[in-house]
Amino acid sequence: MAEHLASIFGTEKDRVNCPFYFKIGACRHGDRCSRLHNRPTVSPTIVLANMYQRPDMITPGVDAQGQPIDPEKMQEHFEDFYEDIYEELSKFGEVETLNVCDNLADHMIGNVYVQFREEEQAVAAHNALQGRFYSGRPIIVEYSPVTDFREATCRQFEENSCNRGGYCNFMHVKQIGRELRRKLYGGRSRRSHGRSRSPSPRHRRGNRDRDDFRRERDGYRGGGDGYRGGGGGGGGDGYRGGDSYRGGGGGGRRGGGSRYDRYDDGGRRRHGSPPRRARSPVRESSEERRAKIEQWNREREEKP
């Protein structure tokens, strides 16, 4: 009996545990799901929920003012964000995988999955990010059950053939350019899919269970097969965090518009028109940006 339960754990045959949360670390029903979400108390992978804010959050390809956004500027905006996150998290250890979801569903939009080489590194990052802010928004950090991203990513999206668009329940991983990849990862190969660390048979079943799981996807999207609860679910409403501005200032080193707001030395937000694509070699280094952020934090904490 125990062997049977272990063999079906995390699959559609498991009527107790949610297979979507187990494989993807997110479920559209959230806490209202009829199956259990077994949240790990420790993991080599952390998720920063809804952290990446696309410039076209309301309508794809259009900014908040209804103006079309240059795809180059959108990619530039994303790569600025990616570089910021990678450099900050690299302080805690070697980042093996950093995936940013390009999905549009509430429970997956902007999710950032970070897998470290060692579990202790993930714990250090998890603890350090508690109560911090990024770009004026609290950071929501949790341990994620995902350790093998091959089972979590959408193959059809990678082949440009996913007909579910941004509302697919598998990860649509947004890609960075080759230049930034070489800069961040150097000669080592970026393991974008991660790796399974558990010796349990449930991690060795391979593509058979993944294909069975995918065949059940349409029933899940329709709310059938034992799933209950409304859409949306998990993640964007209940922000938690500290009282002061910490770790923020990101998301807008080169871009423009409302998403690219800067913070001056007094912590006040100032708006500017979108600058042109920066091609000048004069650009702040990561150390200079971090020094400014630390200065802002100290000044805000010293204020009565």
Swiss-Prot record:
Zinc finger (C3H1-type): 12-40, 148-175
Entry-linked CDD domains: RRM_U2AF35B (cd12539)
Superkingdom of the source species: Eukaryota
Composition-biased stretches (Basic residues): 184-207, 268-280
GO molecular function: DNA binding; pre-mRNA 3'-splice site binding; zinc ion binding
Stored InterPro entries: Nucleotide-bd_a/b_plait_sf, RBD_domain_sf, RRM_dom, U2AF_small, Znf_CCCH
Pfam families, alphabetized: RRM_1, zf-CCCH
Localization, UniProt: Nucleus
Compositionally biased region (Basic and acidic residues): 208-220, 281-304
Domain RRM as annotated: residue spans: 44-146
Residue ranges of the region described as Disordered: 184-304
GO BP term (any one): mRNA splicing, via spliceosome
Keywords: DNA-binding, Metal-binding, mRNA processing, mRNA splicing, Nucleus, Repeat, RNA-binding, Zinc, Zinc-finger
One GO cellular component term noted in the UniProt record for this chain: spliceosomal complex
Biased composition (Gly residues): 221-258
Statement: the UniProt record of this protein carries the keyword Transcription: no
Function noted in UniProt: Necessary for the splicing of pre-mRNA.
Family per similarity comment: Belongs to the splicing factor SR family.
PANTHER family per record: U2 SNRNP AUXILIARY FACTOR, SMALL SUBUNIT
Protein name in UniProt: Splicing factor U2af small subunit B
Source organism phylogeny: Eukaryota, Viridiplantae, Streptophyta, Embryophyta, Tracheophyta
